[in-house]
């Protein structure tokens, strides 16, 4: 045991001796050399004012220059601190620019009949309105009366019609668009037809979108303001109906104007045109660009699986679809994705409660950067101004009644005239921008260095080199002192 301790002491002394010999090979400068080093730095540095302190023999002038330098450094530190504090508040500015163009892209227009289902089909399935409210709940949260959900009629229908396809029912018995319902269609002076519309499902059942997607880019531009899309629709009030209590009591068409790259969103955004009216819609194109966090609230890294372009509405639909598919094992047909379609029993027992759970727990939120669906980094909107006039006039009523082989009363109660035009051939860009970028911050800091101290990046490197050299000398000095102390306090080695 004693032999082991002696070996350890000998090894430690040997190691300490090697370190001491290594450090001793780096001779420390003498006090005279260190003073000369400090003097040379003061005389050669590009930090203005220091050489005036070093070379002045007059003590008063030396003190004045010392006060000037310290004051300048204090102001410099204060200015740089304020710049950094301002930068890390992530300030932004908003720029608005109006771009005039020769041709401007025309938006997509999605329209639906406020009377959603055929009267004959509704008479056979009187509960269809309530069932559709349950199904369309995936698009908009709505209160479903507890009395209705638990009514014997509802439970009996859901239990005995598990193979009932709400999708097929709506598609076959909802509003349709053909040459009878689309009486006249004109886009920029050219005739259009039902083939130019794409069928989509919304909370209004069967809807139809003009200029949807990216497959008609050669068709969706107009070059003259005041000309655009003209539609004359027949809503067939006698053929289609709706329940005035949970449904709609109006007769006419609801439509929404949106980007061709995005799905229609009606909730709170739809425009209505009643029968017997001519709706003149004047639109403008407004593009908005948001900054990513921390300057703004958008997240450019979020991509949607089922949509080409990100939108908050599309993101919310995908979010709901993920939760429902995971917890219910099926997918509502109004939501995007691939999966087994939910039947009525699954809608009733699983989908509807899960939607309430998602809302209560905030599982699909929108708006801020840390929400499920933050705001879009880029979005295009079409603010609209709508004016109405009675349609048709008495003379036009007689003309249309003869042309369509209908009574004048039918013409007044079923026709809807919609006209959508651009007000001007321009679009407005509202862009959120960084108030201070990194290059601007560096330029500002550099300007403060030059203003108060006549310094630059090279000056900072000079100062760093000066302090590093002094730190190196002090470090070696203290290490040598520590080694000497350890060796002196070590017990003498036995012979």
UniProtKB/Swiss-Prot annotation:
Give the organism the record lists: Mus musculus
Answer whether the UniProt record assigns the keyword Ion transport to this protein.
Answer: yes
Give membrane topology per the record: Multi-pass membrane protein
Protein purpose: Forms bile acid-gated sodium channels and may play a role in bile acid-dependent absorption and secretion by epithelial cells of the bile ducts. Displays high selectivity for sodium ions but can also permit the permeation of other cations. The gating could be indirect and the consequence of alterations of the membrane environment of the channel by bile acids. As a sodium channel of type II unipolar brush cells of the vestibulocerebellum, controlling the electrical activity of these cells, could play a role in motor coordination and balance.
> What is this protein's gene name?
Asic5
User: What's the domain of life for this entry?
Assistant: Eukaryota
The main location is membrane
- Give the record's subunit note: Forms homotrimeric channels.
Q: Which keywords describe this protein according to UniProt? A: Cell membrane, Disulfide bond, Glycoprotein, Ion channel, Ion transport, Membrane, Sodium, Sodium channel, Sodium transport, Transmembrane, Transmembrane helix, Transport
The record's GO CC annotations read: apical plasma membrane; membrane; plasma membrane
Motif interval(s): GAS motif: 454-456
Pfam families noted in UniProt: ASC (PF00858)
Q: State if Ligase is listed as a keyword.
A: no
Annotated region described as Binds the plasma membrane and stabilizes the channel in the closed state, given as residue ranges: 1-30
Q: Which InterPro entries match?
A: ENaC
Membrane-side (Cytoplasmic) residue stretches: 1-61, 481-495
Q: Subcellular location, in the record's words?
A: Apical cell membrane; Cell membrane
Q: How is its activity regulated?
A: Inhibited by the diuretic drug amiloride. Contrary to its rat ortholog it is not inhibited by Ca(2+).
Query: Upon deletion of the gene, what happens?
Result: Knockout mice lacking Asic5 have impaired motor coordination which is associated with altered electrical activity of type II unipolar brush cells of the vestibulocerebellum.
Q: Which residue positions carry a glycan here?
A: 147, 163, 179, 370, 405, 421
Transmembrane stretches in the record are: 62-82, 460-480
Name of protein: Bile acid-sensitive ion channel
One annotated GO molecular function: bile acid-gated sodium channel activity
Give the disulfide map.
112-207, 185-192, 298-377, 315-373, 328-350, 330-342
Q: Which chemical reaction does it catalyze?
A: Na(+)(in) = Na(+)(out); Li(+)(in) = Li(+)(out); K(+)(in) = K(+)(out); H(+)(in) = H(+)(out)
